[in-house]
């Protein structure tokens, strides 16, 4: 049986944007407990946010993940970048002041705002490269077109 765990994002993203949620350490500890009880886990890193020092932040996240968990019990790793509807953006901005929406974005075929494809490809490629330092894993991209998968997961 597989249990999924969402790490959401790097510590810097959780601290800045994900109020009242568990820290990355708590999330990894929960995943470790599942593994200790015999479960394989699926890991999801979503949303990946284009923050300053993004490469280091997500590299640190992958290092924490891979050195804290039994990598032989990680079934797959899913990656997804920030995407949202215009309605969600309006709701968030009503509730709090945030710089989350300051990046240049494009409206996708699904009507959701997301980073330009070149930015998404670069973000995913950097993270995949960090993951592959620890071995071969089944990696997938959530909510992405085939051509993005082909560029990133060569």
Indicate where each model-derived feature is located:
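C-terminal accessory extensions appended to soluble enzyme cores
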Residues: 80-84, 90-154
């Amino acid at each position: 049986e597989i249990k999924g765990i969402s790490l959401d994002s790097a510590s810097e993203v959780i601290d800045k944007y994900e109020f009242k949620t568990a820290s990355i350490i708590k999330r990894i500890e929960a995943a470790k407990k599942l593994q200790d009880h015999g479960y394989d886990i699926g890991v999801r890193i979503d949303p990946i946010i284009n923050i300053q020092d993004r490469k280091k932040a997500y590299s640190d996240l992958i290092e924490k993940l891979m050195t804290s968990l039994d990598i032989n019990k990680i079934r797959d790793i899913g990656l997804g970048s920030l995407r949202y509807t215009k309605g969600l953006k309006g709701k968030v901005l009503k509730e709090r002041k945030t710089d989350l929406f300051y990046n240049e974005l494009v409206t996708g075929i699904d009507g959701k705002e997301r980073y330009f494809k070149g930015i998404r490809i670069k973000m995913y490629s950097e993270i995949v490269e960090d993951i592959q330092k620890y071995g071969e894993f089944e990696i997938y991209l959530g909510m992405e077109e085939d051509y993005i998968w082909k560029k990133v997961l060569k």
